[in-house]
Amino acid sequence: MDTLPALRTDIDFLTVHHEGRDMILVRDPLGIVSPNAALSAEIAPYLPLFDGSTSIGNLQIIMMRHQGGSLVFRSAAERIVEDLSRLGILQTDSYRAAKDRITREFANSPERAAFLAGSSYPADPGEAASVLDRILSLPATSAVRLPGPPCALAAPHIDLRVAERTYAAAYRAVRDLAPSAILLLGTGHALGRSRYSISDKTFTTPLGRVPADREATARIRAAAGTAASPDDFAHRNEHSLEFQLLFLQRLFPMEQVPILPVLCGQMEDLFETVRSPLEAPGIASFVEEVSAWISEPPGSKLVVAGVDLSHVG
């Protein structure tokens, strides 16, 4: 082992102060890293060296510099690599095998299971319903007068506990509708270079199962072409749609109202080559196909976007 493995790009590091010590918590949406895993903050200066190109000899040299020039044996550097590898935060063969297994399991499942039940909201159906009903009953902070029934809603996707009144105001505006189907758009936090990720899975929460319009998802995915991710794995851990679905399930008979779940990625890089994202491959045809689906009978369709107008994080 002469070259250090690269750090995983799909995990987050959070610095915390615990029992008088600075620690680094590792947040892994795949669940490969133990939820209780923490690193000593002393290892922080060495983490940038794990880029897939730095030699273990360079790690050894940096370690000596940080220890005031004291001799550091190669075995000490190797021990750091072994510890990080064992935790599951490096791009090793064992990590790739674990990720492949998790990806296959999700791809082969007909359902997208609730990811945040039991952490961001109760996993118990009765308790979850009570929490949502309490939020929906919160008094309005200001009166909103609409010229007619809304056809689209932009709602937050932050933790329910942080934006209760905003969620209440948003979903109060659509509670009297009777949509025949719902286009569910959300910020995709893990889409990489893909513009969209479209899922045809049945979404489940403690409140029940919500089917996808599989014919429509296939049609729209085909229209998007290379703008759409070839799979829907980004939906596995994404919260932006899951939070919207909970409120929709309290307002409408969602087991009978199919959804079209779409995660949307970033497009900033497109402006280096085009004036409008619609000029990029697949995006205009995606928009046209979605618009056609919204206009199709029977009944009226509702668009719900789990997005923040000024998105950070």
Each predicted region: which residue ranges?
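Long, charge-rich, low-complexity alpha-helical segments
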Residues: D22, L30-P125
